[in-house]
Amino acid sequence: MGKRRGGRELARGLSKRQRKHLRQFGEQHPVCDRVSGRPEATQICELSDNSDKSSAESDSETEVEQVSVYHKLLATLKASPESESEEEEDESESEEAGESEAELDSEGSQEPKEAVGGEEEQNDVPEQEEEVAAKDPPEQAFGQEEADGVETSCDPNRGAIEEFTDVKHEAEFSLETNFMEEESGDCDADKRESNSSQAFSEDPFKQHMDKELEEKEVEKISTLSKTSSQSKWPRLGQLTFSSTLEKHTTLKPDKEFSVKQLYLHKPLESTWPKVNKHYLSSASKPSDSFFTPLQRELFCIMNTYRDLFYPERNALTNGEEIRHAYCLHALNHILKANAQVLSNNAKKRDQKPGTDSDDYRDQGLTRPKVLMIVPFRECALRIVHIFISLLEVNEKRKIDVSNKKRFKGEFGSDPDEKPPNLKRPEDYEAVFAGNIDDHFRIGVAILQKSMRLYAPFYSSDIIIASPLGMRTIIGTEGEKKRDFDFLSSIEMLIIDQADIYLMQNWEHVLHLMRHINLLPLDSHGVDFSRVRMPNLNNWSKYYRQTLLFSALQDPQINAIFNKHCFNYVGQVAVRNVPLSGSISRVVVQLPHVFRRIEAENLTSVIDTRFQFFIDKVLPEYRDAIMSHTLIYVPSYFDYVRLRNYFKKEELNFTHICEYTKKAGICRARRSFLKGEKQFLLLTERFHFYKRYTIKGIRNLIFYELPTYSHFYSEICNMMKATDSGVDATWTCTVLYSKYDAQKLAAVVGIDRTAQMLQSKKNVHLFVTGENE
């Protein structure tokens, strides 16, 4: 917040665009200033001063990395969707001309060369791709080019977060120097512990963490394939249980629910009903006043420490229910783990000198136990608020939260920054609510009566971060300042809203999974006599529970769950099939022609699709009669390839992607609406982050099925936005292959998908809408 106030003091004498960006981010945009060609470009000096000042204020743990090609590309990120002005949707020429002059702020990332020449100079992108690809693998180069969509942080040294780390409360939150009696204030702690020893031995936490695997079992998990079984639960639906060890197979939902069966640590048993009451139905039975039906079944699985994949998370309906459930599970795990350490501290303090025992092995090689990956700062803010609410027994017993004010300032949002008449779909508003900066990481340390925000990672119990925030601290091979030792002993990994990372940069998620649960390069002052044997044997990954939540089924998300999760207890995946697809929500009268592409293998699909498009599909639309043709392209790589081909063939087209400036977007939309351009290439990530209504569509081509099934109906329904009276000529063509089975089922339904994939015919027709 302080940066924003400082920015307002510098607002005098700035242009409209600069004042707008200064109000949003508290600093001048370095890319805009560098390429604008206006006298205001000298404002870069002020940005440098602010940046230096901020660096001086940050502590020694601040991540300062060399400015590489990766960081330069990341530095070109732009403002969030909520920074759009009210006149975005206005199609008039006068206002669009005004936007071209005064509203050149972001729509994603701008390439420096592209910014100089405007929309028509976007051929420079492939050249930069080649430069990056020379140093990085293809997936990483793509991620660097895309640079995570609507990032609100415009730091020119994007790889370095201006971090604050709390160093004042180290002793107060140290697990090595505190004891159970001091933490709980209960003189009868030992007596209570002895009375509940039998119950504690039945605790799923105790059973899971104290299990000692044999080498044969580890080898079996590593080499053999999993055996799976099916089960149907009342709320979750069809479940697939898989495990390598035969004794860990299926699980049945509890018919009779008892709070004691949850083994919740104090004070969660008393605070949870108050925190969760907002999501409970007034018609619920008294016995169901603890969980919603969804939470009950999810927590039943979570509490057994199995891996869980739930691909039906919806930001509008059940998103917060799920967030509360996994926060309860994570906090319960942390409180139990810390209580065990503090209790053993007291026992070890009282034991006779010279006596060693393996009974006190209760820790990992590093302290962080829970890693929570979320897409935006707003998500981290909500998680911390849930933690605080769960730890506060009542209004009189508030817990001490260090650096709470700073946390609210950096992770909160200003409601006045959002344009009042910005109209977007409800699901968009739910996903992009609050602070949508996607570059952050924060450590949280918890004891029963207090919480420490901004704790150093090696003194944290929980790390909440975005994939980009983790990527910039993990670094890459050869970088001097990189660190991932703090990930060595992660016992619980929670990846929420995994589908959004497909729109940001999936390579960051893969990079994280490759660096989790590795042996640390340094000891970091650990007491090896307290470290569990599985951690010393480098078997941490076999004990890690992974909770994966997504809004959709996707092969890349499935690969994370199948190839990077090794939990010895087993895995549970929700595998419900869509009975009716999103095509049923298309309201316009429209023939949908689905054309199947025959590809020999998965790697050849990309080239086969391109060749099929230019040989079979595009010639049908070259005629001037087939004007107003929108081509929807999910992959940015395919978009660049098509754009270059269209330019080579000198076709009359325009294009919009996540890197296009607002002025270019306005020109493209206007020329497409008026018919000046026959084709419009549109990327899926642009639609995800902006959700503009593209007017003037008469012919629609889905180069590939959309990642989000509801995007299919949204794009099709855009045709009704133009009252041209020529709806009889509307067409829709969709390309698909047998490798698109999940996406196809989400669009047309599982029954039609089976017929379309097994049929000898390669063309299938569906008609939507009512006859007039």
From Swiss-Prot:
Gene Ontology MF, one: rRNA binding
Region (Promotes p53/TP53 degradation): 1-200, 588-650
Segments of this protein annotated with the region Represses p53/TP53 degradation: 651-712
GO biological process, one term: maturation of SSU-rRNA from tricistronic rRNA transcript (SSU-rRNA, 5.8S rRNA, LSU-rRNA)
Record note on modification: Phosphorylated. Phosphorylation is required to promote p53/TP53 degradation in the nucleolus which promotes cell cycle progression and liver development.
InterPro entries found in the cross-reference section: P-loop_NTPase, UTP25, UTP25_C, UTP25_NTPase-like
Coiled-coil zones: none
Compositionally biased residues, Basic and acidic residues: 24-37
Chief subcellular location: nucleus
Keywords recorded for this protein, A-Z: Developmental protein, Nucleus, Phosphoprotein
Compositionally biased tracts (Acidic residues): 83-108, 117-131
Domain of life where this protein originates: Eukaryota
Ranges for region Disordered: 1-208
Protein name: U3 small nucleolar RNA-associated protein 25 homolog
Role description: Component of the ribosomal small subunit processome for the biogenesis of ribosomes, functions in pre-ribosomal RNA (pre-rRNA) processing. Essential for embryonic development in part through the regulation of p53 pathway. Controls the expansion growth of digestive organs and liver. Also involved in the sympathetic neuronal development. Mediates, with CAPN3, the proteasome-independent degradation of p53/TP53.
Subcellular location(s) of the protein: Nucleus, Nucleolus
GO cellular component: nucleolus; small-subunit processome
Pfam families for this protein: Utp25_C, UTP25_NTPase-like
